[in-house]
Amino acid sequence: MEVNILGVIAVALFILIPTSFLLILYVKTSAENKDN
């Protein structure tokens, strides 16, 4: 079975970008809550 590298990269980006964005937002909000 042949693995399409571009497909793997596309899926990785599709998964990593939103999760990292959510992670950053979560850390930001939790840090702000700690300051209060």
UniProtKB/Swiss-Prot annotation:
Belongs to the PsbM family. PSII is composed of 1 copy each of membrane proteins PsbA, PsbB, PsbC, PsbD, PsbE, PsbF, PsbH, PsbI, PsbJ, PsbK, PsbL, PsbM, PsbT, PsbY, PsbZ, Psb30/Ycf12, at least 3 peripheral proteins of the oxygen-evolving complex and a large number of cofactors. It forms dimeric complexes. Keywords: Chloroplast, Membrane, Photosynthesis, Photosystem II, Plastid, Reaction center, Thylakoid, Transmembrane, Transmembrane helix. Pfam families: PsbM (PF05151). It is found in: Plastid, Chloroplast thylakoid membrane. GO terms for biological process: photosynthesis, light reaction. It is a single-pass membrane protein. The chain crosses the membrane at residues 5-25. The keyword Cytoplasm does not apply. PANTHER family: PHOTOSYSTEM II REACTION CENTER PROTEIN M. One of the components of the core complex of photosystem II (PSII). PSII is a light-driven water:plastoquinone oxidoreductase that uses light energy to abstract electrons from H(2)O, generating O(2) and a proton gradient subsequently used for ATP formation. It consists of a core antenna complex that captures photons, and an electron transfer chain that converts photonic excitation into a charge separation. This subunit is found at the monomer-monomer interface. The keyword Chloroplast applies. GO terms for cellular component: chloroplast thylakoid membrane; photosystem II. It comes from Bigelowiella natans (Pedinomonas minutissima). This is Photosystem II reaction center protein M. The lineage of its organism: Eukaryota, Sar, Rhizaria, Cercozoa, Chlorarachniophyceae. NCBIfam families: PS_II_psbM.
